[in-house]
């Protein structure tokens, strides 16, 4: 039997040959949670009187949603999780100064062919390196922490092929929005999207992480990039580690296929109040903007800050602009490259890796009637603050161009 990437990963994890629709018990390679969900996971373990961990080296904990704590309750939650980490002697703990969980997973932990579960919907981000990564609720994650296993329904595989080279201002967000605009947000329910890149170096890991991150917005069970030379090079660069690639077999059968020609994409936005309300940036041009947010686990990586820096260098922003690299590593690299200095000189507020504005938590909550252009992942009512705010999702080029002009702007139109 020839297998897709999904089938090969889940066959290994379950110890048997699997097919779409099968209900399986799979061994987990990484189990993770953050501050906002972690205390629920711990509560489940406490109520079940099962305070044990299957393998301490395979648990990853990061503080990101409430980092630094904006109120007393947040500080209390983090304090309790720190106590749990200390008592359980967990080595892979990242406090408020390290970064967003999903960025840390691809930088330090996730590998091709792994099964990763975490208590957050954007766990699909780790699919960028070819891992089957899925977000789950606190009870399922607690069970995985205790047993090292989880149950899954093997999803139907859907093949996406990326052809050609993206234009100067096109990145992973435009590919994600292109898929959402064409197929809508509920189409991929029960499916695993496997992305094949014909020219691996034309679509780097930063771009892949953005697309995989948005897989949950497509309602996909997982969104994985087929591992290739870019995968190997990224992991070697970030960790000094050589990896074996897991790839689909020739002739593997897919439910359906779709091809995107990268050189034909335009800068896109998702208009309020849905991720699949996709339009070109030029269709929405001249909409006044109150605040721009560049960052999040969707678009807070080095290439995102390079693009923003290129557009904003030597200019002054015409509206509020908040820029947040997704991890300490990304912040440090962006600082060394001069990108942070360019953004600060342009008038942006820059801070370290926190989820803050994305979930309407802190560091830039949207007010009533405000229009936000954000590189984050969701734009439904109330996501970034007020129910009366309007959030447009975009890639870093549209976000930076909009900050430069004060209204939604295609980067090709910035002088």
Curated annotation (Swiss-Prot):
One GO molecular-function entry: 4 iron, 4 sulfur cluster binding
Gene3D superfamilies, per database record: Aconitase, domain 3
Pfam families (UniProt xref): Aconitase
Details of cofactor binding: Binds 1 [4Fe-4S] cluster per subunit.
Alphabetic keyword roster: 4Fe-4S, Amino-acid biosynthesis, Branched-chain amino acid biosynthesis, Iron, Iron-sulfur, Leucine biosynthesis, Lyase, Metal-binding
One of the GO biological process terms: L-leucine biosynthetic process
Binding site for [4Fe-4S] cluster: 297, 355, 358
Pathway it works in: Amino-acid biosynthesis; L-leucine biosynthesis; L-leucine from 3-methyl-2-oxobutanoate: step 2/4
InterPro entries from the UniProt entry: Acnase/IPM_dHydase_lsu_aba_1/3, Acoase/IPM_deHydtase_lsu_aba, Aconitase_4Fe-4S_BS, Aconitase_4Fe-4S_dom, HAcnase/IPMdehydase_lsu_prok, Homoacnase/IPMdehydase_lsu, IPM_dehydratase_rel_enz, IPMI_cat
Record keyword Amino-acid biosynthesis present: yes
EC code: 4.2.1.33
Named cofactor requirement(s): [4Fe-4S] cluster
Catalytic activity: (2R,3S)-3-isopropylmalate = (2S)-2-isopropylmalate
Superkingdom in the source lineage: Archaea
SUPFAM superfamilies: Aconitase iron-sulfur domain
Family (UniProt): Belongs to the aconitase/IPM isomerase family. LeuC type 2 subfamily.
Function of the molecule: Catalyzes the isomerization between 2-isopropylmalate and 3-isopropylmalate, via the formation of 2-isopropylmaleate.
Assembly and oligomerization: Heterodimer of LeuC and LeuD.
Protein name listed in UniProt: 3-isopropylmalate dehydratase large subunit
């Amino acid at each position: 039997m020839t297998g897709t990437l999904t089938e090969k990963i889940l066959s290994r994890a379950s110890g048997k040959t699997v097919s779409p629709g099968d209900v399986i018990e799979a061994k987990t390679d990484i189990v993770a949670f953050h501050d906002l969900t972690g205390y629920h996971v711990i509560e489940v373990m406490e109520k079940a009187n099962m305070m044990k961990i299957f393998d301490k080296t395979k648990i990853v904990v990061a503080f990101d949603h409430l980092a630094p704590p904006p109120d007393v309750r947040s500080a209390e939650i983090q304090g309790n999780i720190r106590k749990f980490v200390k008592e359980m002697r967990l080595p892979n703990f990242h406090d408020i100064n390290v970064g967003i969980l999903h960025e840390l997973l691809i930088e330090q932990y996730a590998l091709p062919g792994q099964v990763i579960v975490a208590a957050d919907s954007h766990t699909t981000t780790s699919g960028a390196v070819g891992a089957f990564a899925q977000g789950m609720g606190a009870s399922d994650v607690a069970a995985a922490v205790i047993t090292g296993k989880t149950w899954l329904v093997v999803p139907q595989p859907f093949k996406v092929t990326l052809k050609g080279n993206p234009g100067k201002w096109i990145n992973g967000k435009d590919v994600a929005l292109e898929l959402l605009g064409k197929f809508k947000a509920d189409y991929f329910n029960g499916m695993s999207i496997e992305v094949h890149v014909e020219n691996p170096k034309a679509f780097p890991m930063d771009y892949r992480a953005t697309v995989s991150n948005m897989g949950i917005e497509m309602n996909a069970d997982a969104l994985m990039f087929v591992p290739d030379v870019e995968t190997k090079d990224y992991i070697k660069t970030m960790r000094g580690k050589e990896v074996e690639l897991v790839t689909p077999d020739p002739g593997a059968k897919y439910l359906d296929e779709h091809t995107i020609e990268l050189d034909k994409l335009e800068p896109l936005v998702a208009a309020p109040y849905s991720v699949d309300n996709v339009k070109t940036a030029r269709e929405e041009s001249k909409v006044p903007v109150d605040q721009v947010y560049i960052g999040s686990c969707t678009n807070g990586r080095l290439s995102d800050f390079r693009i923003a820096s290129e557009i904003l260098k030597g200019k002054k922003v015409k509206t509020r602009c908040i820029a947040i690299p997704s991890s300490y590593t990304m912040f440090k690299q962006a600082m060394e490259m001069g990108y942070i200095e360019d953004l600060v000189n342009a008038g942006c507020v820059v801070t370290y890796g926190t989820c803050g504005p994305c979930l309407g938590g802190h560091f830039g909550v949207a007010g009533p009637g405000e229009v936000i252009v954000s590189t984050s992942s969701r734009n439904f009512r109330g996501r970034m603050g007020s129910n009366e705010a309007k959030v447009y999702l975009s890639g870093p080029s549209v976000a930076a161009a909009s900050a430069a002009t004060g209204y939604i702007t295609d980067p090709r139109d910035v002088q």
